[in-house]
């Protein structure tokens, strides 16, 4: 795409039509992918994004609800492809695959498929789909090889900017190589065809837009949209008091503790997020190469309700040195690449809590969800199977309202858990419980949202991936302004002959038929003093089962009648006054 430096007058009506048409193209790509994909992680969980990028690797548009941490650095892959092939090295009919960690910086399941689009022989940009493949080979299946991997090659098949179609001609040998090295080739090839179809649709729709309004008008509109988006974001940042703000937290994993230290600098309309204080890379899968955590925190703070494009991040500078856990040097394992991102976002917001006390929420569950994975061989159907889902947690209380319960991480867009009926229909597994986790939300004037309990039983022997908290099992979602932390996540396992559940310390567990796993996701932190919560809201929480009567008494100082029908206002006032005195 030609860079247009000098803005010329655009018809404002046409500009608005194009402004809305671009994300509509990405949305249509998304709908096409969702309807035609083979694996549940795409068509049910929606673990993907669809996007258009220009010939500089800048983001033109993404689908509404696309996985945030997929899109935030998608341009890195396209820029690498441009450097590899040159702008003259792309032809109509090309289809390129890429998941190599040295560039993509994620676990290998997140496969990027992209195609170039042209008008009158000129390359104008790329249609891109990044989607979670159910398997990519390696030592294990599921969400990457997890705790069983010992180097990046044991995590799976690395594909580095390979053209599986060149000028419309398929490379069948390359496709066979991919099929022969993954466990579920039919699903993977079906998903690949879905990704290709979505990209082709994006090509057609963008070309139609150019044919209707003209090349120059569309390209100038895109540049204008970039500039206007940047200006809106900068306008919000300019309202934050200048200064240097810092905060820290941590993650825990089998490979040890990871420090998350953040420094945010505000200078006028510029924001810098410095992650230099985070732990260095190390063995273990919680490494990545991504700016996504910083980008997501910035987008949510500025114009969260508007479509994202390259201008959304133009006012942000991110500092991450090479060798940092967020900018790990290849070769290094990245199976749990995204585990740190929600905590990075929370910690950036925590740093700004003093500057924006009426905007910043308490910490959310801080995890990408308990990894509900079970895989093996189903003798009843004579096939291998894998069950993958994501269990959501609680969001932090806000300055004016409670946190949302059982919601996905801020990093995950519209990702959702898989329906139980579909899980059980297609796999030898029985889901015995999926329910709100009582008392998991942090007490506060505005309570943290609740996590969820999910209990599942194997109907055949297999392997569980029992990763419960995404690295936040010892770092509870913190409260703000007197709010209390939410409960941490945990995973419990039980064999068919065991009388009781026991805590799982391993990310993998070999289970016989009848074995069970319970995932308990974290709740969000509370916002404000729990003793200031309206007693009537505490009563409703007890009656709805969100909190116990004991929590009402112990955490909120609210005395209920024995039948839990009313608040004893006199006893409540006395108890709260007494506790306030004890705090002095």
Identify the meaning behind each predicted range.
Residues 2-92, 100-119, 123-584:
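Glycine/proline-enriched, intrinsically flexible loops and inter-domain linkers
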């Amino acid at each position: 795409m030609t860079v247009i430096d000098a803005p010329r007058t655009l018809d404002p009506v046409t500009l608005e039509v194009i402004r809305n048409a671009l994300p509509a193209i990405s949305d249509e790509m998304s709908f096409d992918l969702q309807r035609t994909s083979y694996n549940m992680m795409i068509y049910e969980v929606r673990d993907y994004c669809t996007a258009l990028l220009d010939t500089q690797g800048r983001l033109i548009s993404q689908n509404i609800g696309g996985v945030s941490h997929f899109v935030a650095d998608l341009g890195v892959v396209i820029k690498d492809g441009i450097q590899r092939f040159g702008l003259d090295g792309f032809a109509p009919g090309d289809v390129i695959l890429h998941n190599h960690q040295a560039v993509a910086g994620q676990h290998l399941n997140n496969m990027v498929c992209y195609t170039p689009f042209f008008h009158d022989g000129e390359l104008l940009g790329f249609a891109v789909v990044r989607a979670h493949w159910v398997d990519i080979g390696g030592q294990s299946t599921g969400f990457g090889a997890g705790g069983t991997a010992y180097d990046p090659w044991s995590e799976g098949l690395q594909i580095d900017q390979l053209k599986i179609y060149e000028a419309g001609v398929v490379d069948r040998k390359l496709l066979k190589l991919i099929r022969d090295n993954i466990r579920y080739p039919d699903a993977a090839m079906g998903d690949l065809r879905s990704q290709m179809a979505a990209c082709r649709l994006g090509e057609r729709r963008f070309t139609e837009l150019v044919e209707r309004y003209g090349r120059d008008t569309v390209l100038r509109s895109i540049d204008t949209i970039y500039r206007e988006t940047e200006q809106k974001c900068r306008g919000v940042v300019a309202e934050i008091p200048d200064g240097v703000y810092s905060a820290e937290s941590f993650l825990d994993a089998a490979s040890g503790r990871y420090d998350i230290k953040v420094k945010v600098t505000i200078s006028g309309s510029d924001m810098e997020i410095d992650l230099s204080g985070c732990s260095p890379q190390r063995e273990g899968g919680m490494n990545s190469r991504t700016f996504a955590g910083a980008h997501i925190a910035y987008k949510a703070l500025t114009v969260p309700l508007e479509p994202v494009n390259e201008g959304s991040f133009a006012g942000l500078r991110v500092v991450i040195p090479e060798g940092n856990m967020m900018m790990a040097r290849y070769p290094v394992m990245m199976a749990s690449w995204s585990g740190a991102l929600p905590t990075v976002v929370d910690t950036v917001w925590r740093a700004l809590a003093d500057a924006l006390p009426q905007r910043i929420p308490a910490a959310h569950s801080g995890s990408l969800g308990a990894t509900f994975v079970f895989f093996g061989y189903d003798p009843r159907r004579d096939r291998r199977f894998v069950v993958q889902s994501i269990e959501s947690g609680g969001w932090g209380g806000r300055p004016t309202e409670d946190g949302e319960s059982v919601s996905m991480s801020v990093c995950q867009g519209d990702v959702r858990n898989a329906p139980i009926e579909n899980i059980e229909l297609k796999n030898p597994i029985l889901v015995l419980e999926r329910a709100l986790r009582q008392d998991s939300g942090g007490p506060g004037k505005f309570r943290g949202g609740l996590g969820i309990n999910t209990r599942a039983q194997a109907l055949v022997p297999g392997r569980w991936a029992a990763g419960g908290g995404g690295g936040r099992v010892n770092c509870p979602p913190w409260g703000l302004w007197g709010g209390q932390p939410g409960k941490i996540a945990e995973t419990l396992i039980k064999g068919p002959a065991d009388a009781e559940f026991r805590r799982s310390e391993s990310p993998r567990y070999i289970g016989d038929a009848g074995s069970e796993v319970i995932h308990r996701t974290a709740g969000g932190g509370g916002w404000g003093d729990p003793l200031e919560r309206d007693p009537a809201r505490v009563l409703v929480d007890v009656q709805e089962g969100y909190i116990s009567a004991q929590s009402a008494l112990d955490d909120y100082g609210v005395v209920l009648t024995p039948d839990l029908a009313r608040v004893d206002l006199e006893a409540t006032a006395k108890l709260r006054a007494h506790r306030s005195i004890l705090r002095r």
